[in-house]
């Protein structure tokens, strides 16, 4: 996601003044977004947080491993509903979003075979350590199968290549994969709310909305 911002999208941290709504004891939605530095992991997470607040839901977020340097591991936890901590507990993720395939594997501990849906981008960014160690990057099907043993479903999306086809840049891969998630109704936030936040951040006629809508059509 890129463009000129009107209102800063930022990490929610512990919580900003949440407007809580009535929720059932187990009414919560847990998302973990991962990738490497420069892919827009934090931006996507903060977009979800703003959308959750817009719908007057209790939202808590956390960024793990600090502000990653470019190509370093990045992880963002987004929790919504009846939650009191910022970190998603083990075996509690409803949704995993991996903007880099290999980065999805360390998140297996958060997955539940009965409910977790994982989305992974097909484009690989090989870690420098693999060249140093002389190891090979696993095939995308191998990564999918390894993750599938922990999840209810794993969906591979050509997010980077499709974003580049639409805009000329893979920068918008995070928005493209979000569009697919919305299309499949795998997230507890309304499409109209996401679009409203994007309009507030980048204006009504911005490329992020174009990418989102293209992903939802295809």
Q: Would you name each region that the model predicts?
A:
Residues 2-9, 13-218:
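Active-site cofactor/cluster-binding pocket
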């Amino acid at each position: 996601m890129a463009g000129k911002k009107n209102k800063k999208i930022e990490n929610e941290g512990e919580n900003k003044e949440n407007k809580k709504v009535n929720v059932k004891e187990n009414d919560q939605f847990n998302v973990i977004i991962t990738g490497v530095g420069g892919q827009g992991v934090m931006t996507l997470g903060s977009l979800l947080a703003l959308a959750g607040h817009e719908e007057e839901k209790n939202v808590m977020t956390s960024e793990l491993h600090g502000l990653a340097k470019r190509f370093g591991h990045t992880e963002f936890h987004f929790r919504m509903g009846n939650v009191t901590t910022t970190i998603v507990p083990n075996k509690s993720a409803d949704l995993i979003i991996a903007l880099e395939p290999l980065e999805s594997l360390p998140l297996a501990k958060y997955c539940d075979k009965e409910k977790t849906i994982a989305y992974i981008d097909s484009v690989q960014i090989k870690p420098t350590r693999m060249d140093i160690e002389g190891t090979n990057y696993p095939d995308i099907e191998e990564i999918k199968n390894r993750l599938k043993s922990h999840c209810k479903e794993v969906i591979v999306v050509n997010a980077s290549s499709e974003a580049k086809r639409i805009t000329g840049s893979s920068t918008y891969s995070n928005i493209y994969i979000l569009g697919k998630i919305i299309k499949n109704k795998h997230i507890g936030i309304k499409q109209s709310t996401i679009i409203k936040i994007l309009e507030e951040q980048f204006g009504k006629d911005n490329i992020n909305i174009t990418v989102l809508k293209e992903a939802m059509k295809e």
